[in-house]
Every structure is written in structure tokens, then in C-alpha cells.
Amino acid sequence: TEGKCFRYTINSEYKANRKYLNQPKYLDEVKERLKAYGFTSISGYEADDLVMSFKAQYSQFESIIVSPDKDILGICEKSFNPRKMEFNYHSEEEIVENFWKSMIVGDTADNIKGIPGKGPAFFKNLTFNADDEESIRTLIFDEYINHFAEYEAIKEFTKNYLSLKIVDT
């Protein structure tokens, strides 16, 4: 993808903690070869979004996503991490749980704050009796309301949700 993704306009702190180095040595060459094969570059999205959109579009086919990126590995039922040389299998329930847990604890790699002072154990206790994703969403939104003033809670919840959510269609 070219340029910054839409998340930067939603969340000015998105990935602000990263120290970007020079682009990979052969990136321009790879881009040219992909272009020669008919691939298109799309602005405003991250590779995670495009991979998951493609996966959703062709959901009738079994797929395994190959990536070292922890974000994408956490949202796929089947994936392979080439850095660790390991396969990962996640149930739909685990994928949902990982997303909503990040809404509570944040994501340090992407500089998403979550709810200060709340960690994985808090998430586990909070959602222990939740029956479905809607129940989890409601519980977490209520925690944002409890922690922040109402306007700030809505703003933070929305900002974090859109920063964490992968576009899949």
C-alpha cells in the first residue's frame, strides 16, 4: 500500500511510538515486479486490511495466511509465521477475544492505549460470563464509561475500535 492508512486520521497517536528506519533494501524492486504482474497499490489501507478483505472475498476457499505480523496472525483462523517457523490456529472465539482484549489492554506496538491500569486478568474477569460478542462489546463500552468522562469514553472507545479493527470487506 502507498501512503499512510486511514487510522492516522482517526488516531494521531497511531504508531507514533515507532522509530521508522529506512525502507527495506529491495522494496522498490518488489513493488515494480508486483506491478509488472498486474498487482495494484491501494492508498489509505494497511496490508492487514487488504489481506483480510481478499480472504473475505474468497472465503469459499481454504486459506493459510503467511506473515510475521502479530496483528494479522491474531485475526486468521489459520496462519504461518515464517520468522518462528510455526503454524497458528485460532478459533473464531479466540479471534473475537483477542480483539476485545486489545480494547482493554491496548496495543503497545501500534501505540493504542486501551484503558489505563487494566490488563488481561481484568479482561478475563470482566468477560467471564459473557455469552456473545455483543455482550463483550457492551461490557467493554461500559468500562470505558466507568473510566473516562462520557464524551471522552465515546471518543476513546471509537478511536481505539477503529484503530484496532481490521477492514475485512
Tell what function each PLM region has.
Residues 1-11:
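Non-catalytic, usually N-terminal nucleic-acid engagement modules in DNA/RNA processing proteins
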Residues 16-169:
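Extended two-metal-dependent nuclease catalytic cores across DNA- and RNA-processing enzymes
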